[in-house]
Regions:
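Nucleotide-sugar-dependent glycosyltransferase catalytic domains
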Residues: 1-204, 208, 213, 222-224, ...
């Protein structure tokens, strides 16, 4: 489409919805192909990727304004013959989307959260395509139960019809979870299928978010000041998790596996230990995430970095508009 627009003399812009570090990684791939080759599967997982080198001084909090990550944008722009980059984030829907059939589920979830103490609930949700097989669900359930902490857990099952189809809600939870689990955790936990993620993250009862690290989920969590425990599943989620944990210090690692094709279970003991650590520790990450929440909100108001970038984009668009002459 860009080629067509160019032939017609119409200005065109690419809307990239991921983060700047991953964008820099993709720009680096041609160089890597020329120097190293295309193999990634057997590559040392600690291989240096230029866009994931944090150029800021040690201990400095990155001025991350959602889709504007300071040093990452500097890398992307440095010495490269590419058009200007307009960092206009946040690009998230703070109202969320609720289909008519989900209203009852949403009301039940929010009512349950209203009854919980502040910052007492760990929220587990893995996006519209995140799902787990039954053995992993059982391990997760046991880990949550043994932790003794409150939880809200969105359980989705892989589609049986098509590998590309979205996961489905479980019809009978008792068949896929440990015997007696639902009864034993009735007082401290709630299991749902679909969950209104934006509204849940905004609720005062949520203390931590166990996430697949889709970029939208990261943005929503940072916006609401909820720290993340990473459990990436597919696509660029591994690199998102790496960036949040190792590069920015804005999340903690529940699971990151940098080798492709790893289907190893996260066992109950690991989950129990992780949840206890999250909920019982005085986390420096939580403090940093709260600060980032404030910075991200400042970025989108008048005078903020994203607000200014959007203004520059509009100016560039208007400068390139050609008004046809009247006949």
């Amino acid at each position: 489409m860009i080629d067509v627009a160019h032939e017609l003399g119409v200005p065109s812009y690419v809307f990239f919805t991921g983060n700047a570090a991953f964008f820099g990684f993709m720009l680096y791939l041609p160089t890597r192909h020329d120097q190293v080759g295309i193999e990634f599967r057997e590559t040392d997982p600690e291989s240096a990727i230029p866009s994931y080198v944090n150029p800021l001084p040690p201990g400095a909090l990155p001025s991350l304004a959602l889709n504007k990550e300071g040093g990452y944008i500097s890398f992307v722009n440095h010495g490269r013959k590419i058009p200007p980059i307009y960092t206009v984030g946040r690009m998230i829907d703070l109202k969320g989307k609720t289909h008519s059939g989900d209203n009852q589920a949403k009301q039940e979830i929010m009512k349950w959260l209203d009854d919980q103490p502040p910052s007492s609930v760990v929220f587990l949700c893995f996006g519209s395509r995140g799902s787990f097989v039954e053995p992993q669900l059982k391990e997760t359930a046991l880990g949550l139960e043994r932790s003794g902490h409150r939880f809200l857990w969105s359980v989705r099952l892989p589609s049986r019809d098509d590998g590309l189809a979205k996961p489905t809600d479980a019809e009978n939870l008792e068949e896929i979870l440990p015997p007696g689990f639902l009864e034993r955790t009735r007082g401290i936990g709630m299991i749902c299928g679909w969950a209104p993620q934006v509204e849940v993250l905004a609720h005062k009862a949520i203390g931590w978010f166990v996430s697949h690290c889709g970029w939208n989920s990261i943005l929503e969590s940072l916006w609401h000041g909820v720290p993340i425990a990473t459990w990436p599943l597919y696509a660029e989620q591994q690199t998102n998790a790496f960036q949040m944990v190792r590069d920015l210090g804005l999340a903690v690692e529940l699971k990151i596996n940098y080798r492709l094709g790893s289907g190893a279970l996260v066992i109950a003991e690991e989950i129990e230990k992780a949840v206890k650590c999250l909920m019982e520790g005085d986390s420096e990450v939580r403090k940093r995430v709260k600060e980032m929440s404030e910075k991200s909100r400042e970025a989108v108001i008048e005078g903020g970095s994203s607000y200014a970038s959007l203004g520059r984009l509009i100016e560039a668009m208007m400068a390139n508009v050609t008004v046809p002459a009247r006949k």
